[in-house]
Amino acid sequence: MRIRRRDEKENQEYKKGLWTVEEDNILMDYVLNHGTGQWNRIVRKTGLKRCGKSCRLRWMNYLSPNVNKGNFTEQEEDLIIRLHKLLGNRWSLIAKRVPGRTDNQVKNYWNTHLSKKLVGDYSSAVKTTGEDDDSPPSLFITAATPSSCHHQQENIYENIAKSFNGVVSASYEDKPKQELAQKDVLMATTNDPSHYYGNNALWVHDDDFELSSLVMMNFASGDVEYCL
């Protein structure tokens, strides 16, 4: 009972809050003379009104000459980010792999800088991707899909010809299918995609007329769909 009351009395006498320069000097002198460990003896040996845990953390996180108090470098930031992906918020394990940094330093730097930086980079990447998706395609070529080409191949040229102004229409009825597939390719220039007719449309810029004969033969036969 007496021991418990004595411990409670000592706990009530412990000082909390910011450390003073005088307290730091007392702690450093003790560690230099007696080494680390047995932190609870500091109160009895020096009269310092700090608990053993507070003394240990003060030494490890601030007073130790092994602690790097400078700004974090880009290499350290990259290392912490990669370690955090593997270990999560296990700051002690991360700090052991970052020389000169304590777990408290790493945790504080992550919460105040790196986490916000990563969120900002992700938002910028999403915004850039969204802007790119909104831009119209420079070349759009479609033909009847394989599932519909059987029903639409007979009138594909007539439908395309009706959907554009100033387009030269190929007379499908007067020519054999093989001749149409090899020679009659219908192209129209327009900047307005609203002139599309269903899935059977050809939209290119004025400078993009050089298409290979093989591509155009496939387009005429309705076997493939091109969207570049």
From Swiss-Prot:
InterPro entries: Homeodomain-like_sf, Myb_dom, Myb_TF_plants, SANT/Myb. Induction: Up-regulated by gibberellins. May be regulated by GEBP and GEBP-like proteins. GO terms for cellular component: nucleus. This is Trichome differentiation protein GL1. GO terms for biological process: cell fate specification; fruit development; gibberellic acid mediated signaling pathway; jasmonic acid mediated signaling pathway; regulation of protein localization; regulation of trichome morphogenesis; trichome differentiation; trichome patterning. Residues 11-63, 64-118 form the HTH myb-type domain. The gene is GL1. The keyword Aminoacyl-tRNA synthetase does not apply. Its main location: nucleus. SMART domains: SANT. Expressed in leaves, stems and flowers. Expressed in trichome cells and in leaf primordia. It comes from Arabidopsis thaliana.
